[in-house]
Amino acid sequence: MLILTRRVGETLMIGDEVTVTVLGVKGNQVRIGVNAPKEVSVHREEIYQRIQSEKSGSPSEGGNF
């Protein structure tokens, strides 16, 4: 795992087309902005896991959504 330190307003690049910008820090929460092409899916981890479990036909952990 690559670990980077960024300040508010600073950006990192993933490949040539994806940028991740630190928008703000408040307590233990960090707000980030992600710019990516439409063909690149961007999800929070828990949403991605729910999508994957729905694709495989497994019931989701949290009940109905």
Swiss-Prot record:
Entries under Pfam families matching the protein: CsrA
Gene Ontology MF, one: mRNA 5'-UTR binding
Top-level division of the source organism's lineage: Bacteria
UniProt-annotated location(s): Cytoplasm
A Gene Ontology term for the protein's cellular component: cytosol
SUPFAM superfamilies associated with the record: CsrA-like
GO BP annotation list: mRNA catabolic process; negative regulation of translational initiation; positive regulation of translational initiation; regulation of carbohydrate metabolic process
Keyword line: Activator, Cytoplasm, Repressor, RNA-binding, Translation regulation
Assembly and oligomerization: Homodimer; the beta-strands of each monomer intercalate to form a hydrophobic core, while the alpha-helices form wings that extend away from the core.
Family to which the UniProt record says this protein belongs: Belongs to the CsrA/RsmA family.
Cited function: A key translational regulator that binds mRNA to regulate translation initiation and/or mRNA stability. Mediates global changes in gene expression, shifting from rapid growth to stress survival by linking envelope stress, the stringent response and the catabolite repression systems. Usually binds in the 5'-UTR; binding at or near the Shine-Dalgarno sequence prevents ribosome-binding, repressing translation, binding elsewhere in the 5'-UTR can activate translation and/or stabilize the mRNA. Its function is antagonized by small RNA(s).
The protein's name: Translational regulator CsrA
Organism, as annotated: Shewanella sp. (strain W3-18-1)
Gene name tied to this protein: csrA
